[in-house]
């Protein structure tokens, strides 16, 4: 996934770097159009060729069989979850805030981030919203976040069981808010580096993802483990639901070409066994819920 540009957005109210949003009486500046279009977005600066290579965040080699002839695509991704689970840290890593002095990054705020990536040979721009608050007075914002996303990252901390239980509640709320839509959702167990403080096992996270029909991944924002894979995955999940069958088949063929032979054999054998064994089918689904390249 190659970084092309980064933009961060916010309303006109000046704020300190570490402040979170509070909702003013007139919150119209928070409203986001449902279908962003390139013409409506602020002009962005492209990186110099050498910077483009140096700051590559790529998931592909140069032998991609898929072109980006249809142009750039925009996806609005919303971070939700309990306070203190690492949502803002994930957002900052995504936006390149930690190395912003070395990047061509225009800082307009702290709660909305925009970044253009190349995943499987095709450009996609993620507009990442990190405006979820847990205070009661922000109920309007909760409802707004539940409605505007093209995809959702429900984040919990593996060191905090209460945040895991809250993540399950948020998945139910999201299902109710978007009943007729097949919205991509990834359950994100953050802080995986804190092994000795773990309260939620990997198997529990996977089981929850299977029950609530979403994907699952564990990350560590502190050491940036699986963060790249997370944002690659959410792009792929949206594409799988939106794009034509033929286009997705080409992407799948590209991914399978890079897959090892032993892994192909295990996947094929697993499908055969699962046909006649419901328990095995559940186990395989649990194992596949972390594969962000398939539905």
Curated annotation (Swiss-Prot):
- Binding residues annotated for GTP, in chain numbering: 81-88, 190-193
The highest taxon in the source lineage is: Eukaryota
Its PTM note reads: Phosphorylated on tyrosine residues.
Q: Which gene underlies this protein? A: Gem
State whether keyword Amino-acid biosynthesis applies.
no
For this chain, one GO molecular function annotation is:
GTPase activity
Region annotation (Disordered) ranges: 39-64
A biological process term (GO) from this entry: mitotic cell cycle
Q: Does the keyword DNA damage apply?
A: no
Its quaternary organisation is: Interacts with calmodulin in a Ca(2+)-dependent manner. Calmodulin binding significantly decreases GTP binding. Binds ROCK1.
Please state what the protein is called.
GTP-binding protein GEM
Give the source species. Mus musculus
- Gene3D superfamilies, A to Z: P-loop containing nucleotide triphosphate hydrolases
Please describe what this protein does.
Answer: Could be a regulatory protein, possibly participating in receptor-mediated signal transduction at the plasma membrane. Has guanine nucleotide-binding activity but undetectable intrinsic GTPase activity.
Coiled-coil regions listed in the entry: none
